[in-house]
Amino acid sequence: MLSRRHFIGAAAASLAVASGATAQDSCAIFTPERQKAITPEGAVQLLKDGNARFLAGKSINCDLLAQVRATASGQSPFAAIVGCIDSRVPPELVFDQRIGDVFAARVAGNFVNDDIIGSLEFATKLAGAKAIVVLGHTECGAIKGGVDGAKLGLLTKMLENFDPAVQAAKATGGTQSSKNKAFVQATADANVLLTVKKLTDRSEVLRELVAQKQLVIVAAMHDISTGTVKFFG
């Protein structure tokens, strides 16, 4: 007859084996077959699940060098993320993803222009990504600069990209100032939503993929004080 200690030890060993298998499966790279099998909605859910792991302190620990070797001959990311250059919002970390999982385009204030849109057309139509996430964040310095109309070299022209969002935020009332947190956040929210709209307005390629249900484009907001990512809609 097994002793209680033996039984507990055996159970723990079995659990460790099961957990190891799960972690190993989660570290598997995205192959063309895995990418093809996932739905656009499933791709978004993977990002939501990853953020939940990040918040719970249960990010998956993988052998990244092994993933470097495994992806050397090709890539099949399941999603593309348009994010800010802010050092506090690394998309692969906040969504608990690894090498070869996502495309990441980053620019101050997470806006898009033809260069970024063209990159997203590549990521989706040619490389097969099933979801695009426009990821903003709280306390965004670029958004604050747009709200105040800051002047500094080439930054001055870049900040004009946020003018439509600033105008949208004015409709909510409040003082237009970077010191007004509510106005800044209203601008950041409007910016990600307007950017989602711009992607399909500007790109026939993306518009057709969405119409064919091969792609979803969503807006999200990362709270830099908690790590939580809120998805809109």
Predicted regions span which residues?
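Boundary at the C-terminal end of the N-terminal hydrophobic targeting segment
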Residues: A21-A23
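Short active-site oxyanion
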Residues: F78-A80, A129-I132
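Short beta-strand segments
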Residues: V82-C84, R106, V133-H137, V218-H222
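Active-site cofactor/substrate anionic-group-binding motifs, chiefly glycine-
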Residues: I85-N110, D115
